[in-house]
Amino acid sequence: MNFRYNQTPFGYQRRKTREVKVGDVKVGGNNPIVIQSMINSDTTDTQGSVKQILELERAGCEIVRLTVPSQADADNLPSIRQELKKAGSKVPLVADIHFTPSVAMKAVEYVEKVRINPGNFADKKKFAVRDYTDLEYNQELERISEVFSPLVLRCKELGVSMRIGTNHGSLSDRIMNRYGDTPQGMVESALEFIRIAESLGYYDIIVSMKASNPQVMVQAYRMLASRFNELKMDYPLHLGVTEAGDGNDGRIKSAIGIGSLLEDGLGDTIRVSLTEDPVLEVPVAKLLADKFNKKISNLNSVKGYSEFRNPFSYNRFYSSEIKIVQFEAGENHPVRVETILPFENSNSFLENVAKLYQYGKSLSIEPESILVDSPLPDQLKEISEAATALSIPVGILLSKNVSLNEKLQKELLSFPKIVFDPFLQFQDGEKMLSFLKERQNAGLFSEIHTSGDKLDSLRGLPDTLSEIGIKNVLFSLDSKEILYDYRKLGSILSRFEFPILLHGSFSNPEEALYNSAIGIGGLLIDGIGDLIRISTSKIKDIEEIFQLSYDLLQGTRLRLTKTEYISCPSCGRTLFDLQETTARIKSRTGHLKGVKIAVMGCIVNGPGEMADADFGYVGAGPGKVHLYRGKEIVLKNVPSEIADEKLVQLIKDNGLWQDPSND
């Protein structure tokens, strides 16, 4: 299989795409990344829709989408256009179409772009299981062409662009039966429609591969880019994690998916889907886009590194086990979290640890490992004594200006793990190896931690360690280019079993949230990393960073430490107040660690985008809700006033309920 989906995974270069115009906005080519959002007003409500569109435009949104589910909605588009013209608005509009080709033919006359979902534009979801012969499959494609071609020709005639937007949760029965519920199925679904459009000489196309799981979403976009390379296609990509949710969780998932793809040079326009006021999506999208609009190509230091991943499938990078008393990491253990704390004296240190435990208790999480940040050598004895009061390992991060003399090496034998830079702390390589051997013989671990610009100098060290039998070593980096440099480290270590700790040091919690989600999150979804360690320079941020670390693991779906919510951002199809409903359900179920609950406004993507959710709450009509167990409806048309209670009872009936703690 050809794993190439971009110029290189080890440096930045934006993928070259054709330019597609959406009204006066240019997407792709050499243009900046374009920011989009979607209103959640009913499209038949002219004033409500216009108000939201203008608010988004003022916030910096460059393209606005609105749902057009019925003929009545399409008929109201001229009124919306007229009011926008009066207000002096020039923002291009996108009509979002599902199930209704006839409505698309009307809507195309009043918008700059049409979005169609290849999973339901010409197909009705029946969840039928059948094997298609090649002849039957081609007959299905001919049927689709008959339904889709009139819209393509009308778009071509009017100069209207189109997004062919695949959703992981709404693949057609035909695709599901041939390719399964997979990234490959998502890609082939879009390609079927692209080929039809191309056969009619239409190329003003933008493509998306959305999923609520960032891992699936990233794999699908990479596979699409790889297939585009094979087929000599250069269509721009619209990036988004659908149903990302709200608050920090929604922002983390979006940054993992969108940000890591932008790092790979993929993406020409983005939408951050939050279950919040649409205006609040824009600053998040701008933050992500600005980072990459300012980024210049950098392929200077990529030679000598080779791809060691399957970028289209999750496979954890295998490493040997780290075992310190009850602490276990690496091998098949969950990704662990290490917390950095300062040390002034025993009392303040133990007080900070106690606060961390207390905060962790409120999250139903216990701290797992502590690293003392750059203590003075004469503090080591006091730290060692304080650590005896704790049941978790306490390691030492050596200050860069500390030289590892023999006296200090002996004192460090009191600590289960130390972190040092081999290029700063040892002048003599033989002495370093002797030191590592001594620690291993004592059952202790050492973390080799250096800067990303020293990677070339690090290349021969794993071979040397293996040759002399040193195994109790893990590797980490201090880098501003977390994703690229850790991929380089992964390439160096791919023949070995040394564990990798993903380290990120940031100036404040907001920077930590976005950049750790992009860098560390982007690595985790590829199976790279056995531990993570995120820090800022301020002790007051410790609790926030502690929670961020576990939220990041939750966002990658690698470790669930709280209830997982999949909730759509709401649109004109939504049949209830989604933000209020989501908040209400969270208040009832937020203590159910590891349970996945989907809250969906309507049935368009609801059942499918619930993906691997355990339970679903999906709008079925005004004042009515369907409740799901997995993808199966178990209660239909439940009155919304009792739906919350019925959901709780459904969770209880399936043995996944536990009463909230009184702590």
From Swiss-Prot:
EC number: 1.17.7.3
Pathway this chain belongs to: Isoprenoid biosynthesis; isopentenyl diphosphate biosynthesis via DXP pathway; isopentenyl diphosphate from 1-deoxy-D-xylulose 5-phosphate: step 5/6
Note describing how the cofactor binds: Binds 1 [4Fe-4S] cluster.
Binding positions ([4Fe-4S] cluster): 568, 571, 602, 609
Record's catalysed reaction(s): (2E)-4-hydroxy-3-methylbut-2-enyl diphosphate + oxidized [flavodoxin] + H2O + 2 H(+) = 2-C-methyl-D-erythritol 2,4-cyclic diphosphate + reduced [flavodoxin]
GO molecular function, one term: 4-hydroxy-3-methylbut-2-en-1-yl diphosphate synthase activity (ferredoxin)
Pfam families referenced in this protein's UniProt entry, alphabetically: GcpE (PF04551)
Entry's Gene Ontology BP terms: isopentenyl diphosphate biosynthetic process, methylerythritol 4-phosphate pathway; terpenoid biosynthetic process
InterPro entries: Dihydropteroate_synth-like_sf, IspG_atypical, IspG_bac-typ, NO2/SO3_Rdtase_4Fe4S_sf
Name of the protein described by the UniProt record: 4-hydroxy-3-methylbut-2-en-1-yl diphosphate synthase (flavodoxin)
Originating organism: Leptospira interrogans serogroup Icterohaemorrhagiae serovar Lai (strain 56601)
Gene: ispG
